[in-house]
Swiss-Prot record:
Cofactor or coenzyme needed: pyruvate
InterPro entries: PS_Dcarbxylase, PSD-A
Active site, per annotation: 183 (schiff-base intermediate with substrate)
Organism: Chlorobaculum parvum (strain DSM 263 / NCIMB 8327) (Chlorobium vibrioforme subsp. thiosulfatophilum)
GO BP annotations listed: phosphatidylethanolamine biosynthetic process
Taxonomy of the source species: Bacteria, Pseudomonadati, Chlorobiota, Chlorobiia, Chlorobiales
Compartment(s) where it occurs, according to its Swiss-Prot or TrEMBL record: Cell membrane
Free-text function comment from the UniProt entry: Catalyzes the formation of phosphatidylethanolamine (PtdEtn) from phosphatidylserine (PtdSer).
Protein name: Phosphatidylserine decarboxylase proenzyme
Coiled-coil zones: none
Post-translational modification (record): Is synthesized initially as an inactive proenzyme. Formation of the active enzyme involves a self-maturation process in which the active site pyruvoyl group is generated from an internal serine residue via an autocatalytic post-translational modification. Two non-identical subunits are generated from the proenzyme in this reaction, and the pyruvate is formed at the N-terminus of the alpha chain, which is derived from the carboxyl end of the proenzyme.
Similarity comment text for this entry: Belongs to the phosphatidylserine decarboxylase family. PSD-A subfamily.
Length: 214
């Protein structure tokens, strides 16, 4: 199982402490010691599962815009967005704690702007979280025009990781961060993108195609 680069330190630290407690369990009175060893082993497996980064086959079709996250589409609507303009399409992907947590670039381009916004920690399936919760807003200049997407913290997930920098050139499918313990990713596509995704669709980050430049 490949581990996300954003979790290497946490996995190493967890593995060391779990190893110590696992061995300690054999020297404690039983069955309490065995229960301790089993508990720390399960915790280690959960940590590995949480930080997993499975291989993904990135679509190579010209003009494809891919999902930036694993999850389920819970909202799709036409909006007038200050970055992408009137007639844009908002697609919201809800990430459960059991989904892969890493996030990927939806389409190649250049990072125009990063905007961290502190906020609340409403449940991610509450659509107010888009405007009220802590989030990282990202603007890309692409062949489709300017697109905007956002990592949103949730009630459980309170740690956003984003390693992008303004001016950075990025490629479709590249890792750029993660939202620990899930939450949601919102993406706003300009009118130049024909969005084929629909509410209820399950997405695989880096693989599922949300729409096409036309």
């Amino acid at each position: 199982m490949r581990i996300s680069p954003y979790g290497a330190g946490s996995v190493t630290t967890t593995a060391i402490f779990c190893s110590l407690f696992f061995v300690t369990g054999f020297f404690l009175p039983q069955p309490g010691g065995a229960a301790l060893s089993l508990a720390v082993l399960l915790f280690l497996f959960f940590t590995l599962f949480f930080y997993r980064d499975p291989e993904r086959e990135i679509p190579t079709e010209p003009g494809a815009v891919i999902a930036p996250a694993d999850g389920k589409i819970v909202l799709k609507q036409s909006i007038d967005h200050p970055v992408t303009g009137d007639g844009s399409t908002l697609v919201s992907i809800f990430m459960s704690p059991f989904n892969v947590h890493v996030n990927r670039i939806p389409i190649s381009g250049r990072v125009l702007n990063l905007n961290y916004v502190p906020g609340k920690y409403l449940m991610a399936f509450d659509h107010r979280s888009m405007t009220d919760n802590e989030r990282m807003e990202i603007t890309l200049e692409t062949a489709a025009g300017t697109i905007w997407f956002c990592q949103v913290s949730g009630f459980v997930a309170r740690r956003i990781v984003c390693d992008l920098k303004p001016g950075q050139e990025v490629t479709t499918g590249n890792l750029f961060g993660m939202i620990k313990l899930g939450s949601r990713v919102d993406i706003v596509l300009p009118p130049s993108v024909k969005v084929s995704a629909s509410v209820g669709m399950k997405t695989v980050g880096g693989t599922t195609i949300l729409g096409w430049i036309y």
